[in-house]
């Protein structure tokens, strides 16, 4: 087994182990940050899909009933320095075309997120975040929390309260006399997720409420006041400000007094105070645009770099990774650090055997920030980046202008093929239960799954292969795997596109492509024609030149075309069904030009997409409407020549507010 495979397997085993402890045995051994650290180390193997690998939460625990959130419980975007906060403030000002925006600042409680539902004032249900869309039903457990309101006086209809459950530091010391828990966060998680509510009742759980859905409040500060009036616990540390200086001042004040608090916090949360503006800002794929978590400063530690080894990812990138003498950095035991690429190694002059300084900020993958050259032994050789792939022996290549070095043998390199297969069956792609990393490697080595479509013809080949003779396989486990594969023969278009593992086409880009082309045949036929003209694809808002070039490269290879034909013969790929079928903009291709006065270009695009439109930057005969603001460019003249209907800003506002064109 190669170094890459060993590390990949080790990380996956660790994640699976902690999943069982956290979700099934209620005995978590590591914090959320440490768990995220493992996942992001795993994602480091394939750095180009790092953003698409990140998830909002964890899958719902099968031991509990599932609760679907009416509004997703999204995570927050993170910042780790003042520049990140400044960027957040500037971005929302540009989006809303506002010079002054009121921001509410609150501490970020290091606890467990919850949602509580009230019907006509009566507490009826509570759920965890889960994966952000579906959580676990913990109604009976939340009901045992001392002081948690069971009835809200004068409340009619449905009301949802969200917040954070925690255990205070003083209570944790009493609870943890036998060192059963690693920290207060894990103790709270383990206590809340008990099948026996009596155990939960015996634990000193507390909470802070911070969100109210279904009320009439107009601002976040009003929400907090209302929650307090209804009898909920609300954190006393909060501040309203309209300036960057005010935001940073609150951060510094709380940072300096954090050890005087009787509960753990790991940063500050900034929220746009006006709820109407929050609604206008909307959400990205993973987080609300109206909020930011400014995590506390990075933690540093020194250790020895034992060895630099190379990982080969799904797209062929050779990524150097530092193997370290394990060191505790901010409560997390770090034994690996990212070295990014050969340019980074040369720039910092990193060598095996060096004493290095490790930086860890929040849940970001640890980085080497400094090398102690005074401690370096004489004649320590420079690290030489391999000229051949460590997995298949092929001569590596580096594209001009890129730092990444790649193995070109996309289909002959075992490491790449195994990683492609793992990606294909992963949770966000085909999600084939029972076909995990170890099983993929097992079937690949046996020659039973060499190509992606082999997965769906596995049953036929097993007729000639006695799998029951292999360790760990029996009649039941084989039947379960084949049933799992069979159940995944129907898939949505966006998940199918994502499953192919095309460079620069992550979950968000796959959704954009699916929404734009609607059906697999439309998408496939358009991609086949890319060699003739890719301007339409480049114009799709959010795809860009790199994504278009990557798709063009993918579809130029006969191997990929054959793979798609073989694969689609086994599948049913569902077309996109629009949730905006009654909108006059549904499935219309829209292009913007000129300056809009009432809203930013960014907000206009979001509004258009919400109504089912396809936003493009490329004007063609296929364009349905050109939205023209002040001082329109050459697109206006071209639209006239092509006969594309042109809407001015007043007409545009009628469309998005009234649903009419004139």
Swiss-Prot record:
Its cofactor is Mg(2+); Mn(2+). This is DNA ligase. Zn(2+) binds at residues 389, 392, 407, 413. SUPFAM superfamilies: BRCT domain (SSF52113), DNA ligase/mRNA capping enzyme, catalytic domain (SSF56091), Nucleic acid-binding proteins (SSF50249), RuvA domain 2-like (SSF47781). The keyword DNA damage applies. The active site is at residue 108. GO terms for molecular function: DNA ligase (NAD+) activity; metal ion binding. InterPro entries: BRCT_dom (IPR001357), BRCT_dom_sf (IPR036420), DisA/LigA_HHH (IPR041663), DNA_ligase (IPR001679), DNA_ligase_AS (IPR018239), DNA_ligase_CS (IPR033136), DNAligase_adenylation (IPR013839), DNAligase_N (IPR013840). It holds the Pfam family HHH_2. Keywords: DNA damage, DNA repair, DNA replication, Ligase, Magnesium, Manganese, Metal-binding, NAD, Zinc. GO terms for biological process: DNA repair; DNA replication. Coiled coil: none annotated. It is an enzyme of class 6 (ligase). The keyword Ribosomal protein does not apply. It catalyses: NAD(+) + (deoxyribonucleotide)n-3'-hydroxyl + 5'-phospho-(deoxyribonucleotide)m = (deoxyribonucleotide)n+m + AMP + beta-nicotinamide D-nucleotide. Its EC number is 6.5.1.2. DNA ligase that catalyzes the formation of phosphodiester linkages between 5'-phosphoryl and 3'-hydroxyl groups in double-stranded DNA using NAD as a coenzyme and as the energy source for the reaction. It is essential for DNA replication and repair of damaged DNA. NAD(+) binds at residues 32-36, 75-76, 106, 129, 164, 271, 295. Residues 580-662 form the BRCT domain. Belongs to the NAD-dependent DNA ligase family. LigA subfamily. GO terms for cellular component: cytosol. It comes from the Bacteria.
């Amino acid at each position: 087994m190669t170094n890459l495979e060993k590390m990949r397997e080790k990380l996956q085993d660790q994640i699976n182990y902690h999943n069982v402890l956290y979700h099934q045995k209620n005995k978590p051994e590591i914090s959320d940050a440490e768990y995220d650290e493992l996942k992001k180390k795993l994602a480091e193997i394939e750095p180009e899909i790092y953003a698409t690998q990140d998830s909002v939460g964890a899958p719902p625990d099968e031991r509990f009933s599932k609760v679907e959130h009416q509004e997703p419980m999204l995570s927050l975007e993170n910042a780790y320095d003042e520049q990140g906060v400044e960027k957040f403030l500037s971005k929302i000002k540009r989006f809303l075309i506002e010079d002054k925006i009121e921001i509410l600042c609150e501490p970020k409680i290091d606890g467990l997120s919850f949602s509580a539902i009230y019907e006509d004032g009566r507490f009826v249900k509570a759920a965890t975040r889960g994966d952000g869309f579906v959580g676990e039903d913990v109604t009976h457990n939340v009901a045992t929390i001392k002081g948690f309101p069971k009835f809200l006086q004068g409340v009619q209809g449905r009301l949802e309260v969200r917040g954070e459950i925690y255990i205070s530091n003083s209570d944790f010391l009493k609870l943890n006399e036998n060192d059963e828990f690693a920290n207060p966060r894990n103790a709270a998680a383990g206590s809340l997720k008990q099948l026996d509510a009596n155990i939960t009742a015996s634990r000193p759980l507390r909470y802070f409420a911070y969100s109210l859905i279904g009320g009439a409040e107009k601002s976040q500060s009003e929400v907090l006041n209302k929650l307090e009036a209804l009898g909920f616990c609300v954190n006393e540390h909060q501040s309203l400000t309209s300036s960057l200086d005010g935001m940073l001042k609150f951060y510094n004040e709380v940072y300096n007094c954090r050890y005087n608090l009787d509960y753990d916090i790991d940063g500050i949360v900034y929220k746009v105070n006006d709820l109407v503006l929050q609604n206008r800002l909307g959400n990205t794929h993973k987080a609300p645009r109206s909020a930011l978590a400014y995590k506390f400063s990075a933690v540093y530690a020194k250790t020895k770099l034992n060895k630099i080894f190379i990982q080969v990812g799904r797209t062929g990138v050779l990524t150097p990774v530092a193997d370290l003498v394990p060191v505790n950095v901010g409560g997390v035991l770090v034994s690996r650090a990212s070295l990014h690429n050969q340019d980074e190694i040369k720039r910092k002059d990193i060598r095996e055997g060096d004493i290095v300084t490790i930086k860890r900020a929040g849940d970001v993958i640890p980085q080497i920030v400094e090398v102690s050259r005074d401690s370096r032994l004489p004649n320590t050789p420079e690290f030489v980046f391999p000229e051949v792939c460590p997995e298949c022996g092929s001569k590596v290549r580096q594209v001009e202008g890129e730092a990444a070095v790649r193995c070109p043998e996309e289909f002959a390199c075992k490491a790449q093929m195994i990683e492609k297969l793992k990606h294909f069956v992963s949770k966000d792609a085909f999600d084939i239960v029972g076909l995990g990393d170890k099983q993929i490697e097992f079937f690949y080595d046996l020659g039973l799954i060499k190509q992606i479509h082999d997965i769906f013809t596995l049953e036929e080949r097993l007729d000639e292969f006695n799998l029951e003779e292999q360790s760990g396989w029996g009649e039941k486990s084989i039947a379960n795997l084949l049933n799992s594969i069979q159940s995944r023969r129907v898939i949505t278009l966006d998940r199918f596109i994502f499953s192919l593992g095309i460079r620069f086409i992550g979950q968000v880009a796959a959704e954009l492509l699916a929404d734009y082309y609607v059906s697999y045949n439309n998408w496939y036929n358009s991609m086949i024609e890319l060699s003739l003209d890719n301007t339409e694809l480049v114009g799709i808002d959010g795809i860009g030149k790199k994504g278009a070039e990557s798709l063009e490269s993918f579809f130029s290879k006969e191997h990929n075309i054959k793979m798609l034909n073989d694969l689609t013969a086994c599948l049913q790929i569902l077309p996109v069904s629009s949730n905006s079928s009654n909108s006059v903009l549904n499935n219309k291709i829209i292009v913007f030009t000129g300056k809009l006065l009432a809203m930013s270009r960014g907000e206009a695009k979001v509004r258009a997409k919400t109504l089912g439109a396809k936003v493009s930057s490329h004007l063609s005969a296929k364009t349905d409407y050109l939205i023209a603001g002040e001082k329109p460019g050459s697109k206006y003249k071209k639209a006239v020549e092509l006969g594309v209907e042109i809407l001015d800003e007043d007409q545009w506002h009628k469309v998005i507010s009234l649903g009419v064109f004139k």
